[in-house]
């Protein structure tokens, strides 16, 4: 099995990644680290894995071939780059980075080290997403001129995803799911972008309401 280290044991690291790996014979959870040490100890009890106090120690001593980066959004790029330079594949939670420059640095590091880099856009693997892409790309319903996607919910959150210093906000942490699918459905480079950001209900200092309009070269609108 492929040995995996997990950095960050919050909702994504534990509830999504470890839950999916649990019971899959193709993978072995080899090492973990989290800012809250008690979380690491809980995972160690279940899987008998190595526990490290921080990322640096994990990358120096973990018996792992791949590293899952499920940390605050502002740390995705530096930790992924560290993992790649340590000679391991990196599976990074979305968003990839906080800037195009950092994203390009991640890609160039993967190329230079010969290691694999995967950004975890899990929605693209859902059966309904794959079916939707097939229907649009095959033109079975004719030429698509407009695509609409909507996600609704209400919550008065006050955690790291509502704070700018951690690169929180709906645009960074929720919209990547829909932008990833939308860009593939558009099937052409984006020519125009309109974006309206508002903070309506959540605490913190970032947006919790986003309206995005994309217009592609092929005249499709998303």
Predicted segment positions?
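N-terminal Rossmann-like dinucleotide-binding module
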Residues: 1-47
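Predominantly a Rossmann-like dinucleotide-binding segment in NAD(P)-dependent oxidoreductases
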Residues: 12, 123-203
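Short, Asp-centered acidic motifs that coordinate Mg2+ and/or phosphate
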Residues: 31, 65-66, 146, 221
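Beta-loop-alpha module in the N-terminal Rossmann-like domain of NAD(P)-dependent dehydrogenases
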Residues: 49-109
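Short loop/edge segments at beta-strand edges and connector loops
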Residues: 53, 92, 119-121, 194-197
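Rossmann-fold dehydrogenase core element
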Residues: 105-122, 142-147
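Active-site beta-strand termini and strand-to-loop segments that position acidic
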Residues: 212-219
């Amino acid at each position: 099995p492929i040995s995996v280290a997990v950095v960050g044991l919050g909702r994504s690291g534990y509830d999504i990644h470890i839950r999916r790996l649990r019971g899959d014979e193709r993978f072995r959870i080899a090492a973990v680290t989290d800012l809250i040490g008690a979380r690491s100890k809980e995972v160690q009890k279940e899987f008998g894995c190595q526990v490290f106090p921080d990322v640096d120690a994990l990358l120096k001593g973990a018996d792992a071939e791949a590293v899952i980066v499920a940390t605050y959004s502002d740390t995705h790029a530096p930790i992924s780059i560290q993992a790649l330079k340590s000679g391991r594949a990196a599976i990074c939670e979305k968003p990839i980075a906080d800037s195009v420059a950092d994203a390009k640095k991640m890609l160039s590091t993967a190329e230079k080290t010969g290691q694999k880099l995967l950004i975890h856009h899990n929605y693209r693997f859902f059966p309904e997403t794959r079916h939707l892409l097939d229907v649009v790309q095959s033109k079975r319903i004719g030429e698509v001129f407009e695509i609409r996607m909507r996600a609704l919910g209400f919550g008065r959150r006050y955690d790291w995803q509502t704070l700018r210093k951690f690169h929180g906000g709906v645009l960074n942490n929720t919209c990547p799911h829909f932008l990833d699918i939308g860009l593939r459905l558009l099937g052409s480079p984006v020519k125009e972008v309109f974006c309206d950001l508002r903070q309506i209900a959540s605490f913190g200092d970032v947006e919790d309401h986003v309206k995005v309009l994309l217009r592609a070269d092929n005249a499709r609108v998303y």
